[in-house]
A protein has these predicted regions:
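Conserved catalytic or regulatory cores that recognize and/or transform ribose-phosphate-containing ligands
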Residues: 2-4, 63, 161
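Charged, structured surface patches that assemble and position nucleic-acid processing machinery
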Residues: 10-15, 19-26, 102, 122-161
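Acidic-and-aromatic substrate-binding clefts and catalytic sites of carbohydrate-active enzymes
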Residues: 42-49, 112-114
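Active-site beta-strand-loop-beta-strand hairpin of nuclease catalytic cores
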Residues: 52-70
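Catalytic cores of nucleic-acid endonucleases
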Residues: 68-126
């Protein structure tokens, strides 16, 4: 069966995501941050709350993580617009999460040769107005060896009116 939107060489996109979460767990543990999968916390606007399962997290250390293993669309380095809507959804969950939690978007570092920027850099440049100020974005290369960590600071990011 032809599956044009499935990652080449993978069983399924769900497997890609779970494998990426396992890499994230190892990277955080190597930094003394011990997380669990599917941490459920109450989220919502106002008094009405509903449990949301964050990809990774720890109630004791008050950390929540959403993992996204997305790439530029092959073969032409096109923007994966539909996938970035999922990043926007993650930003909303971070916004309505309980106060006091450290919030990390953990993403695959994928560089567009045509644009000369990573997907995360593109996201910050294009959707920076949707990123809460307390969200950190961590990019990891495909082999899990190098992590680029940045805190998002709206004062440094200018958007057009």
């Amino acid at each position: 069966m032809n599956k044009p939107h499935q990652r080449v060489g993978s069983i399924s996109n769900a497997h890609v995501g779970k494998d990426f979460e396992a890499v994230a767990l190892e990277i955080f543990a190597s930094r003394g941050i011990y997380l669990e999968s599917d941490l459920k916390l109450p989220v919502g606007v106002g008094e009405h709350k509903k449990l949301h399962a964050f990809d990774l997290g720890c109630e004791e250390q008050m950390i929540i993580v959403e993992c996204k293993c997305h790439k530029w669309t092959a073969p032409n380095d096109n923007v994966p617009s539909a996938k970035l809507t999922v990043w926007n959804e993650a930003m909303y969950y971070f916004l309505v999460a309980p106060q006091g939690y450290r919030k990390i978007l953990f993403v695959l570092r994928d560089v567009s040769e045509r644009r000369q920027e990573t997907l995360a850099e593109y996201y910050v440049r294009t959707y920076g107005h949707l990123i809460p100020e307390d969200v950190e974005i961590w990019e990891v290369d495909e082999d899990g060896q190098e992590v680029v960590q940045q805190s998002f600071n709206k004062a440094l990011h200018r958007t057009s009116r």
